[in-house]
Amino acid sequence: MKHLRSIEELGKEDLLRLLDSTEHMAEINRRPIPKVPALRGKTVVSLFFEDSTRTRLSFETAAKRLSAEIMTFSVSTSSVNKGESLRDTVETITDMGVHAFVVRHKSAGVPWQIAQWTNASIINAGDGAHQHPTQALVDCYTVREAIGRSSFEGLNVTIVGDIKHSRVARSNIAAFTMLGAQVTLVAPPTLLPTHIAQWPVRVSHSLDVVIASTDVLYMLRLQSERMDQGLIPNLGEYGNRFGLTDQRAQRLQESAVVMHPGPMNRGVEMHVDPADLPNSLIHKQVANGVSVRMAVLFDVLARGGELNSLKEEGVA
C-alpha cells in the first residue's frame, strides 16, 4: 500500500495481512538484537504537530529496528515558528529525498492534504478527532493475541467515554466491525457525535447495563483539549457514572479484557490501577505498538525484492 491514512482505506484482507505481518515483527522484537535491514536506505520523517509519547516513540523505534533513518521534526525549533506554511514545510522536507511522513495534526484531513504535496508515503498518526489507524491495528492485534483467533465474530466490544472527540473510537469501530465484532458505545449524550445513528454500533448511556456482557472493555479519556465547556457536569460525577471502579471491574466476565489507548486520567475514567487488574491489556497495547508500526512501515515502504530481506531473516 502507498499510504495508511484511515482504516476505511483498508479492506478486510489488508487488515488481516497487517496483523499477520505484525506477528513476524513481534518475533524480531523478541530477539536479543531486535533489528533487521529490511528498510535500510529508507528515510522516515516524524512530523508531529501535537504532543505524543507512545505513538511517536513507537514509530521511531519501529523505523530504527527495520534499519530506516528517522528524522524527527520539532515544531518549536522549525521555520513554522517563522510563519512557514505546512505546504512549504512538507515540500522542503520532500526535497531532501525522504520516503515517508508519519503525521500527527490537530486538524482532520491533514494527511490527505499532505499527500497532494509530496510523492512520499503518508502514515496517519492521528488527525484531530478523525482517525488513528495504527492505534486500531494495535488494539486488534492485542485482542487477537488475547483470544487466540483472527475472527472477532461473537465478540462484544464496549467503548466507553468521550466518543465525540476520539479519533481512536472512530478507527476502532471500523476495524473491530470489519473483523466481525459487535461494538457498543457508552457515553453521556453530550459526548456522542450527532451522526451516531449512521454508525454500525449500539449505544448505551449506562456502563452498568452493559458491563456484564462485555468481552472487551475499552476505556477512553476525556479529551479536554478538544472539548467545549459544559459537556459534562464535573469530573467527579462523570467518573462515578462512566469510570471503571473496583465494583464495576468485579462485574466483568472472567474472560473479559480491559484496554485503554493512553494517556490515562486516573480517578476519572480509571479508578483502578491497571496493574491490579489480571485481565488488563493496557501494557500489552504499548508493547505491541512497536511491532504493529514496524509492520505498517514495512508494508508502506518495502518494494519488490526488498521483501527478501525479511525472508532471509526467516520471518516473512
Walk through the language-model features, giving the residues of each.
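Positively charged, low-complexity intrinsically disordered leader regions
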Residues: 1-61, 311
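Glycine-rich phosphate/diphosphate-binding loop of Rossmann-like nucleotide-binding domains
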Residues: 49-61, 144-220
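Phosphate-coordination loops involved in phosphoryl transfer and adenosine-cofactor binding
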Residues: 39-44, 152-157, 255
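Short, structured coil segments at secondary-structure junctions
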Residues: 66, 97, 117-119, 179, ...
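Adenosine-phosphate binding glycine-rich loop
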Residues: 255-256, 261-316
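Rossmann-like adenosine-cofactor binding region
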Residues: 196-273
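Phosphate/diphosphate ligand-binding glycine-rich loop within oxidoreductases
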Residues: 33, 37-144, 266
